[in-house]
C-alpha cells in the first residue's frame, strides 16, 4: 500500500450514516445557527487510518505501507470544532472500527471490490 507524503497528516472522518443522522437531527431541531460543524471531534494520522483499515479487512496478512515523498503531505490537520453540535445534543454514534467493517461489507455485498 502506498500513501502520499509521510502519512503524518491528521484527518477527521465520519461514517455516512452518522452524517445523515446529523442532517435530519438538525433539520428537525430548527436551530437559528447558520453553520453547525458535524464530525466526530477525533482525528488520526493517515497512516493510523491505513493500519486500522488493513487490520480490520485483512487481519491475516501483513501489508507493508510505503510512503511516496514525491506526493504532498497535505494540510497538517483537519478536524472540526463540534462543540455547537454537542451543545444541541448531537454526537456521532459509529466507532471508526465499526464504520470500516460496515463500509467494507457494503462494498462486498455490492460486488464493488
Q: Over which residues does each language-model region extend?
A:
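C-terminal substrate-binding subdomain of Rossmann-fold SDR/epimerase-dehydratase oxidoreductases
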Residues: 1-113
